[in-house]
């Protein structure tokens, strides 16, 4: 039977500990604070920005949103990052993706102070993941970590499983592949240069399929079989104008294929935002360890 894997109970579980940690910091007159940076008006960016702001308000975390219109000079965004790095009241910085093509994403990302890199986008953070290093001061890419949290909390062991990941971004595909390999899964990564027939075969052969390409509704019945777990990371606009994922759920279910899947919204995104804010709190605690 088909099964919806909601991220909301997992979020609520994380929230309990997070709320206590925030209260402990506030007793020391420390208010966790993050800054979001958005260039342009991509629907996925705006959706995530709103979710971060809403959750921050709920938890009592301070959140500043910095918004630039597309066409802004790159050096103006660089200047903002420098100022945020120097601001002792800012504990975390996140650049909302995607950035316009004319902006050097890697350059901007690596300008973030690694101690404030709450979404693990810098080379420093990525190198720690490559070396499987975690000494308590390591941040992991929140969306990738959310996928792992969902599997763990669904009592799904990754060890020994065949996993196919669609997408190779620095925020999801690449870090998630490394996390799963560190947990002894067998990984296949499909991307824009993968032939469609090979991608379909790789998906059908997998126990777990992760969709993280932003190709809204792009994965239909051809990619799936009974008994699979599908983690849908996509957040785009569906045909009805509402937020939708990469999975064409209607087509898959109408074909009578029984899968377990994360909904959009209410799946991966629900966990991702809370993990991001947990990292803000972690960054604040690292700065004021006592």
Predicted regions and their residues:
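Positively charged, low-complexity intrinsically disordered leader regions
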Residues: 1-30
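Short beta-strand segments enriched in small/hydrophobic residues
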Residues: 31-40
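Short beta-strand segments
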Residues: 38, 94-98, 212
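Glycine-rich phosphate/diphosphate-binding loop of Rossmann-like nucleotide-binding domains
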Residues: 39-53, 137-229, 233, 238, ...
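Short beta-strand elements in bilobed, periplasmic/extracellular small-molecule ligand-binding domains
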Residues: 56-70, 187-190
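Short, well-structured alpha-helical segments in soluble
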Residues: 76-88
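Anion-binding alpha/beta catalytic cores of soluble intermediary-metabolism enzymes, centered on
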Residues: 94-158, 217
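Rossmann-fold NAD(P)-binding glycine/threonine-rich loop
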Residues: 106-117, 126-127, 234-288
